[in-house]
Structures are given as C-alpha cells and as structure tokens.
Amino acid sequence: MAHQTGIHATEELKEFFAKARAGSIRLIKVIIEDEQLVLGASQEPVGRWDQDYDRAVLPLLDAQEPCYLLFRLDSQNAQGFEWLFLAWSPDNSPVRLKMLYAATRATVKKEFGGGHIKDELFGTVKDDLSLAGYQKHLSSCAAPAPLTSAERELQQIRINEVKTEISVESKHQTLQGLAFPLQPEAQRALQQLKQKTVNYIQLKLDLERETIELVHTEPTNVAQLPSRIPRDAARYHFFLYKHTHEGDALESVVFIYSMPGYKCSIKERMLYSSCKSRLLDSVEQDFQLEIAKKIEIGDGAELTAEFLYDEVHPKQHAFKQAFAKPKGPGGKRGHKRLIRGPGENGEDS
C-alpha cells in the first residue's frame, strides 16, 4: 500500500491527461513542483511505439531529478490506448526527493486513470527504462518462464506442497514453504532483537549453502531505513520501530521483505518467496518475537516514517474508535435507539 503525500495534479495537467488519452500524444513527463504534479514535457508520436521509445524516453531522464513518464503504446483496451508508467529515481538524486516521488507514485496513476496503464517500470539507471530494459521486464514476467533444472526442481517442490493432503494434523503445515536453517550469527542477532540490544537485522539467503545468513545489525533509525534496502538484491529485514501512538510509547517489530523485481533471478525470487513463511514461523515460535506488521516492498524509498506508521496503525482503526460513542439522532427517536452487542439478533422496534 503506497503512502499518499497530499500532492495532486494541477487542473492544466488533468486537462492534458484527457487530451493525451485520446491518442495524440506519445509521451508525457510529470514532475513535482511547488507540491503539485505538473507537466514537465510531452512528445507526439513519430513512428511505431518501439521506434519512438528510446528516442523519446531516454533524453528526458535527468541524472539528478526523479520524474514520472507515461508512454503510449499502439495497443488498445476497452478504455482506449494502453500506456506504460515509468518511475525514474536516479541514484544521484537526494534521498528526500526519492522518498517524495515514491510516495506520490500511486497518486499519479490514479490521476491519469489506472485502467489505461498496461504495465509499469521502476528505474535508477537509464538501462532500466530503455526499450531493452522493458523487453527484459516482459521476458521475466512471461509465463511459463524458462527454468534451469534446479529451478524446475524447486517449482515441483512447491507444486507438491500445494497437493499435500490436508488433514486435522497437517492443515497447519501445508504451504509453509522451504526451511533454510538460520546460521548461528543470525540466531544470535534475533535473540539480541528480542532483548532489544539491537534494533535492526538484515538477513540474506546463501543460495549455494541453502542457509539464512546475517548481513549486519547496524543501528538504524526510521530516516536511515530506506538506505538499508539493497537496490539489486533481495533481503529480509527486522526493524524495532520505536514510535508514539495515541500518547503511548511503543516498540513494534516490523518485518520487511524487499525484492527489487526483475533485477533478481527467477531462482532468487522463488527461493526468497518460498523461505519467507518458514522464517517468520521460526522467529515467532522459536524466538518468541511478536511481529506487529509484515511488509513487502520493491524500493527502499517507500519506507517513509508516515508509511510505516500507517502500516502498523491502519487508518480504519481510527474509524472504529470514532464510532465507539456515536451521537444519537435528534428527537424522541434518539432516546429509544439501542446499540446491540455482537451476540444480539433482535430487531429495532
């Protein structure tokens, strides 16, 4: 769930979106300026979409400034032309800008119209968002993907897990995934997290040894958390999130599974996904660590302070509290109205 920043499109940009959706525009560049989404640049089609792609997209990717690009394909769906949504966040741009653009990404798609967007890409270097990068993305998403013998074996393991007979004894063990053992250093780190002598743990899979290894336990605060997320490798993270909620000081353990998409091999994606549930079971049962929230991300810039708070304390909780003492309607009817408990099935008289 993407955190919303309160930034919205200007009326001029909304009008341009409407014009572009009709098919007269090949590319739209959107930037954040004065806390608003504004039109940065646009281009009309010259040739086929694949002929226009690199010459339209690549020159608009600034080495220092993030941006959003909407690129029109030649294919159509029921709503009209299909578009690619490209999120550009270069390595050299300031962390504050990266976080702002990551948190506003969902708003841009909503303002443009999510039904028009066929696919989306995220890039930190130009190769990520080039035509070759897009084709690589399509290849990685294609099903069935080409598998090595080891990957086919892993796939068969997962299929067999699905087919496991569900009985009273086995139903809680079905689909629990692969269990790579935690190395001693990783176990010690989890014990330290339970004792609150460390506040951050990063773990990785050793694919050759089939173990879960400790990467580091560097002290980390919320502001530093995005920088802990590798851009080119998957990781498991445990973070002791210290914050205040409704006047109470809390320390909540948050699990973060970071997977930077197609930058990882199919085997790596499958193994990290398959090992995750068994790792969490071990952490909660063997180490008696209560995990307040489990989050999956593709980019560290998503981990803003507000995003973490909203994940641990979803806003719907506030609505429940608001309805705890509803105001009765005016007039005599207000004195007769009852709020029934969850076990009562009577009807209003």
Swiss-Prot record:
The organism of origin for this protein? Mus musculus
Entry protein name: Twinfilin-2
Taxonomic placement: Eukaryota, Metazoa, Chordata, Craniata, Vertebrata
As stated in the Swiss-Prot or TrEMBL entry, residues carrying the post-translational modification Phosphotyrosine are 309
| Residue stretches of biased makeup (Basic residues) | 330-339
Q: Where found?
A: Cytoplasm, Cytoskeleton; Cytoplasm, Perinuclear region; Cell projection, Stereocilium
PTM entry text: Phosphorylated on both serine/threonine and tyrosine.
What function is annotated for this protein? Actin-binding protein involved in motile and morphological processes. Inhibits actin polymerization, likely by sequestering G-actin. By capping the barbed ends of filaments, it also regulates motility. Seems to play an important role in clathrin-mediated endocytosis and distribution of endocytic organelles. May play a role in regulating the mature length of the middle and short rows of stereocilia.
Give me the gene this protein comes from: Twf2
Q: Where is the ADF-H domain?
A: 4-139, 177-313
Tissue specificity, per the record, is:
Isoform 1 is ubiquitously expressed (at protein level). Isoform 2 expression is restricted to heart and skeletal muscle where it is the predominant form.
- Subunit description: Interacts with G-actin; ADP-actin form and capping protein (CP). Isoform 2 interacts (via its N-terminal ADF-H domain) with G-actin (ADP-bound form) with significantly higher affinity than isoform 1. May also be able to interact with TWF1 and phosphoinositides, PI(4,5)P2. When bound to PI(4,5)P2, it is down-regulated. Interacts with MYO7A.
Where on the tree of life does the source sit, at the highest rank? Answer: Eukaryota
Query: Which Pfam families has this protein been placed in?
Result: Cofilin_ADF
